[in-house]
Design a protein with these regions (language model features):
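N-terminal acidic leader/helix
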Residues: 1-19, 23-30
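Short, mixed-charge low-complexity intrinsically disordered segments
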Residues: 13, 29-45
């Protein structure tokens, strides 16, 4: 499984290829100010 962070307004991928959900959630928490519309999605491999 691969976790990605996308901007829900523009549908652009902010960051991808997180192996663990926790890492993607931390990215959103740390960079939330820079990406206020960021959301975690799961991509099946």
């Amino acid at each position: 499984m691969c976790f990605m962070v996308i901007d829900v307004v523009t549908d652009e991928i902010v960051e991808s290829n997180f192996e663990y959900k926790h890492h993607a959630e931390l990215f959103i928490e740390v960079h939330g100010k820079d990406y206020p519309n960021a959301e975690l999605i799961v991509e099946s491999a």
